[in-house]
């Protein structure tokens, strides 16, 4: 009898004791789907000649079915330990929220709220009112609006203010913002006509002056936060662009990307303009993200002059891009922390990680290492070494943040295997491999990550 013919049938598997236990815990369709999935993989292996006889033993098949049931019933979106040293890690969810936001999220998520109800007037209200005043107070802008992400904010602004007309932008600012989404594509989708000026590395005020015509709806400035052009370069500042716009009676819009609300230069973090700087420069419409340097949830934030924000609030596209109540609650909770700069720096994880000093990180690393060593097998070797962290999230591409790394080694386990096994844990642990060692960057580790790291390292000895 061939191995293919020996693969057990579904009805036989359902009679196994192990399967009956699973059926007593999980819905029958869940177990059946797991059985069929395992049988499909066994048949595929048999056809390709890679199936081994021991893989058909009842215990082996039952174990695979149990693992498949566990996989299919587990949440797909899970907590991950970020030991990569990339603070605003796009693939790991960007900025973690402050725990100060949790009480408000709990209240809004599990009950009714005044999302679109004016409690004073007893009539329909606006969901945007919950953060508009806050944003205006924090940035100095006249009006504000929020949507579901910054690309949506740019799309809405261009659709409302420049559909069918020209938008003048420097060639050096036609950036790709990630996921193959490019500024020219967003502009085209919004119905705007792109008018490029200058060159990749140099754009001058005269380039804008010469490009303005009766068809010009906007002068657009895009902050190149995710790359840097160095050497023989020239660009037109926001202040200069506003002056050009006023001379020609053309409004100015700026997509500044990361959306920093605090001056981080005292911490050695320079080069990212704050939202307030663009407002003071007189830019009419400013868009930025909520989940990058701001340290909140994914959102697209629009601030600026009332006469230019008003058309956005009436545009049909706004409903398709509108922010949901949980994101709105998380954003309001985060923004309220900015009323006290010291509180924001202490309580918003992204800011706390970015501004941590090298000495502070070294102290934390020694503390973390002691805790991990106490809970890990003796054959796990942990040493501390210096290294570099990155901001991530398309901000400060050239900035290197000094940090302390925990280097993990184990006999008989390569760094690549260690990385795979730690990533496969119930709470995955991610890090990076450099010069033959698996590394965890203390900057992006949280205090409550340590038990998960210790448990993951202990599993290596099993």
Swiss-Prot record:
Keywords: Cytoplasm, Protein biosynthesis, Pyridoxal phosphate, Selenium, Transferase. It is found in: Cytoplasm. It catalyses: L-seryl-tRNA(Sec) + selenophosphate + H(+) = L-selenocysteinyl-tRNA(Sec) + phosphate. Its main location: cytoplasm. Its EC number is 2.9.1.1. One of its GO terms (cellular component) is cytoplasm. Pfam families: Se-cys_synth_N (PF12390), SelA (PF03841). One of its GO terms (biological process) is selenocysteine incorporation. Belongs to the SelA family. HAMAP family: SelA (MF_00423). This is L-seryl-tRNA(Sec) selenium transferase. It comes from Geobacter metallireducens (strain ATCC 53774 / DSM 7210 / GS-15).
């Amino acid at each position: 009898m061939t191995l293919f013919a020996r693969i057990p049938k579904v009805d036989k598997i359902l009679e196994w004791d192990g399967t009956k236990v699973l059926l007593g815990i999980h819905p029958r369709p869940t177990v059946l789907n797991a059985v069929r999935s395992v049988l499909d993989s066994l048949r595929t292996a048999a056809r390709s000649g890679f199936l081994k006889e021991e893989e058909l033993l009842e215990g082996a098949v039952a174990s695979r079915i149990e693992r498949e049931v566990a996989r299919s019933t587990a949440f797909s979106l899970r907590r991950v330990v970020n030991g990569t040293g990339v603070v605003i890690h796009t693939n790991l969810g960007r900025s973690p929220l402050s725990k100060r936001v949790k009480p408000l999220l709990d209240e809004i998520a599990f009950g009714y709220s005044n999302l679109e109800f004016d409690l004073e007037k007893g009539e329909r209200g606006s969901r945007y009112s919950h953060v508009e005043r806050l944003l205006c107070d924090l940035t100095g802008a006249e009006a504000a609006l929020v949507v579901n992400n910054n690309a949506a904010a740019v799309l809405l602004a261009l659709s409302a203010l420049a559909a069918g007309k020209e938008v003048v932008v420097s060639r050096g600012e036609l950036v790709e913002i990630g996921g193959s989404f490019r500024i020219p594509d967003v502009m085209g989708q919004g119905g705007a006509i792109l008018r490029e000026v200058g060159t990749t590395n140099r754009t001058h005020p005269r380039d804008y002056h010469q490009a303005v015509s009766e068809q010009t709806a906007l002068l657009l400035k895009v902050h190149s936060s995710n790359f840097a052009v160095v050497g023989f370069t020239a660009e037109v500042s926001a202040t200069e662009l506003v002056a050009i716009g006023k001379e020609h009676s053309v409004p100015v819009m700026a997509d500044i990307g990361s959306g920093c609300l605090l001056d981080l230069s005292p911490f050695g973090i320079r080069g990212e303009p704050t939202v307030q700087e663009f407002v003071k420069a007189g830019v009419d419409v400013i868009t930025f993200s909520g989940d990058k340097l701001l340290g909140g949830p994914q959102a697209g934030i629009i601030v600026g002059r009332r006469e230019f924000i008003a058309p956005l609030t009436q545009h049909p596209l706004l409903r398709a891009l509108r922010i949901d109540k949980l994101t709105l609650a998380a954003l309001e909770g985060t923004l309220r922390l900015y009323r006290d700069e010291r509180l924001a720096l202490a309580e918003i994880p992204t800011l706390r990680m970015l501004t941590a000093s090298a000495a502070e990180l070294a102290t934390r690393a020694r503390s973390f290492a002691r805790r991990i060593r106490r809970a890990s097998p003796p054959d796990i070797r942990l040493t501390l070494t210096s290294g570099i962290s990155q901001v991530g999230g398309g901000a400060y591409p050239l900035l290197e943040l000094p940090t302390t790394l925990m280097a993990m080694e184990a006999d008989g386990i390569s760094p690549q295997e260690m990385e795979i096994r730690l990533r496969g844990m119930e709470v995955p642990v991610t890090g990076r491999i450099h010069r033959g060692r698996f590394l965890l960057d203390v900057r992006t580790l949280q205090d409550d990550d340590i038990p998960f790291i210790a448990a993951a390292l202990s599993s290596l000895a099993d």
